[in-house]
Structure formats: structure tokens, C-alpha cells
């Protein structure tokens, strides 16, 4: 069977894992498109994307255009004569001129069961809304965001303690397998395309750091989901003594305390910092002070008892 020649477009660690698998398959990645290098951190040091780092190691030609509407870039991509393009968390729109230039098409690996959770944050959205399952969808791309025909998909259960980080790693493992299987179907010309039902389409929202501030006027179960969805980024936090404290793990205590105010600390012990919310108690178990490591709350019972005394409203 003829090996496929592939142009790969991706940027993040998630993308890099797929690129790594493709370079070890029978197919050939002849070029990579990734986002331009960007300054990061306090020192604004230029950082290469995970996809670029791997591409350098594997001696794969790299394109880093600021946008893909440039005719010169489009000609360069066309002249590579690739069979197809695979897009995994690239982060930029692919114009029609590129989508239509490959004999085998342009496919995208998306981390949801489309048409549910189109957009940039499908994993976080699935956790935030309490979905019991998510998955990977492989779609043939069109000009609309995540609206192409589905050519393969696989389900993945969401466990009660799953975070965006743990769910991402599960989706990487199953996604790589379904992508390789899809390439086999494409190579054999036995792909079956399925239109998405627009009536069932939902859209995930972009997330910013300001969304991570915990609002105790919210029910405990929603806050607990938020903490899992925002782990490992942007990480939920609350303010005490004008200090932002990150929350990495919390559990719901199904108790209603009508005598306590919203945001009031009702217990502080080895089990956690227990805070009254709009409904039920949220028990903070793993937290992080600025510049410090993540710790279990039991580690600060003695040193921070004046910070989290019972009755304090935060």
C-alpha cells in the first residue's frame, strides 16, 4: 500500500504527540506548519512550540507563517505535492485555498464528539457541563469552524475526578489510534463521510485567567467542576489577605449550612478548608501559594491557622 505524504499543522504538546506518532508510522510527514515563535514568561524569552522542537529533531521542514492567506506561502505549500494535510490544535484558521489543494483532503483531529463542543475549549467545556463522555472526532475540514463531515470518531468516558490534564492524556492515546486507522481508510479509499447535525451543535468558549476566580456565590458542584476544568490552566484561585491562592483539588461536602454566610470558612482541618457556597460546602484539599509548590491543606494547619480561621468570610 502506498504511503501517504502529509503536511502536518499543529502547535501545542497535544499536537506534538500526534506528530510523533505519524513520524513513526508507515506514512511520511514532508513538512510542518506551526505558529510563530513567541516570547514567554517574565524574561520574555523566545520559546519554540513543542511541534517545532520535535520537527527540528526529526529534520522535518518547518513553516511558521503569521497567517495562511499569503499567496507565497500557499504556493510553497502547494508545490510540496502532499497527498493530504492533518490539522491538530494548530490555533489558526485554514483558508479555503489550502483546504482544497490536497488530493486526499485536509482532516482535523478534534477533542469532542462533534457537533457537541465545537471551538477552542472542548475538553474544558465537557467537564464544566458535567458530560459523562467525550471523545475524538476526525473530520474533513471545510471553511466553517469544526463543521466538516465526520469520517471517524471514538468515545471516551469522563470520570468524576478527571481534570482537563488527565482527560487530555486519555484523548491523546485513543486519538492517535483512531487517526492512524482513519489514514488506513483514506489510503484504501473506503472513507464514509457523515454530515454533522447542526441542530445539535454547541460551542465552547475561550477561557481567560479572569474566569478562574472562584465565586462563592456559585453552587459547590459547579465550583468543583470549574477547578477540574481549569487544571492545569489557568488554575482556579481565591483571594485571602490580598494574596491569590490557587486551588488544584477540591471535593463537595453535601451539607447545607443555613447559618453560615456565602464565602464563610466553616472548618479548617487536615481534611481541607471548607467554605460555604450558594449551595453546599466546597472542601479545598490541594492549594498553592504564589511562588510555592502545590501542597495538601494539612501541611499548613499550624502555620496558616490565622489565615483560615472558622467564621472568616473570604
Swiss-Prot record:
The keyword Transferase applies. It comes from the Bacteria. InterPro entries: Fmt (IPR005794), Formyl_trans_C (IPR005793), Formyl_trans_C_sf (IPR037022), Formyl_transf_N (IPR002376), Formyl_transf_N_sf (IPR036477), Formyl_transferase-like_C_sf (IPR011034), GART_AS (IPR001555), Met-tRNA-FMT_C (IPR044135). Its EC number is 2.1.2.9. One of its GO terms (cellular component) is cytosol. (6S)-5,6,7,8-tetrahydrofolate binds at residues 112-115. The keyword Protein biosynthesis applies. Keywords: Protein biosynthesis, Transferase. GO terms for molecular function: methionyl-tRNA formyltransferase activity. CDD domains: FMT_core_Met-tRNA-FMT_N, Met_tRNA_FMT_C. It catalyses: L-methionyl-tRNA(fMet) + (6R)-10-formyltetrahydrofolate = N-formyl-L-methionyl-tRNA(fMet) + (6S)-5,6,7,8-tetrahydrofolate + H(+). Attaches a formyl group to the free amino group of methionyl-tRNA(fMet). The formyl group appears to play a dual role in the initiator identity of N-formylmethionyl-tRNA by promoting its recognition by IF2 and preventing the misappropriation of this tRNA by the elongation apparatus. Belongs to the Fmt family. This is Methionyl-tRNA formyltransferase. It comes from Buchnera aphidicola subsp. Schizaphis graminum (strain Sg).
